[in-house]
């Protein structure tokens, strides 16, 4: 059985401009602590795979010490593979080229759908994704996609909007998502945690944000812990379980 974590919209290093400088600094440290708690959970539970579906950072130019903190934390979880799909906040090269990425971190670049295949334990896993290069991505990254190789476990890690064709934030349709044939679509951009849903043979959800940053971000926060088992090349043989995990 493959176990992995799905998180998104962490927004490290926000300005918190409505707060005093001292209060803003304290809230930024609290966000870091929540992220660090998630990393410690990954280490303690020996989770081998984590999908970060965009907006790990709040801007395309976070502070250098914030970059060092985040990359060092992920590197310390050396037995976990991290896949990141940059979103409309942490787009472009200034974030992802500032330091050499840890060996266990993969970042999807460019607005085109691409993939990486890796072995996680006994499982051959293909992770698909794209990355924002500017603050908008009006093209549908799933347009024209022919579908996955069902002999492997296929996961989509994506910052996007669903069934909003005029959205400037990587609009994809439910019809395309179902036709693509992913086993699980780990979505980001919507800050309210979504209930786990299913389209055809594809499970999907928005992870929501790791921690609320203002009074309009209430409700369930955290990440999804996913366990799935796939036998053979038939998607209907998929065993799937999802659990909500809080880190605050």
List the model feature ranges, each with a label.
Residues 1-69:
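N-terminal active-site segment of His-dependent metallophosphoesterases
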Residues 3, 124, 239-240:
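Short, mixed charged/polar active-site loops
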Residues 38, 80, 105-106, 242-244, ...:
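Generic preference for hydrophobic/aromatic residues in regular secondary structure cores
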Residues 43, 153, 234-235:
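Intrinsic-disorder/low-complexity regions
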Residues 49, 58-221, 227:
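His/Asp/Glu-rich metal-coordinating catalytic cores
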Residues 215-248:
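C-terminal functional module detector
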């Amino acid at each position: 059985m493959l176990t992995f974590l799905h998180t998104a919209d962490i927004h490290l290093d926000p300005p918190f401009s409505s707060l005093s400088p001292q209060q803003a600094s304290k809230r930024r440290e609290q966000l870091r602590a929540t992220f660090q708690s998630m990393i410690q959970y990954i280490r303690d539970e020996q989770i081998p795979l984590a999908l970060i579906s965009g907006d790990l950072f709040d801007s395309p130019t976070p502070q250098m010490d914030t970059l060092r903190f985040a990359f060092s934390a992920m590197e310390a979880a050396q037995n976990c593979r991290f896949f990141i799909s940059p979103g409309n906040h942490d787009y472009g090269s200034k974030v992802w080229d500032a330091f050499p990425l840890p060996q266990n971190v993969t970042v999807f670049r460019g607005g085109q759908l691409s993939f990486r295949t890796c072995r996680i334990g006994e499982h051959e896993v293909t992770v698909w994704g794209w990355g924002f290069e500017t603050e908008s991505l009006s093209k549908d990254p799933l347009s024209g996609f022919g579908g996955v190789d069902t002999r492997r476990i296929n996961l989509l890690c994506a910052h996007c909007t669903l069934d909003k064709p005029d959205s400037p934030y990587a609009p994809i349709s439910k019809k395309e998502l179902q036709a693509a044939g992913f086993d699980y679509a780990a979505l980001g951009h919507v800050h309210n945690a979504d209930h786990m849903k299913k389209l055809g043979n594809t499970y999907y959800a928005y992870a929501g944000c790791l921690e609320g940053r203002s009074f309009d971000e209430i409700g369930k926060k955290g990440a999804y812990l996913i366990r799935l088992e796939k036998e053979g090349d038939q998607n209907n043989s998929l065993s799937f379980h999802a659990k909500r995990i809080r880190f605050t």
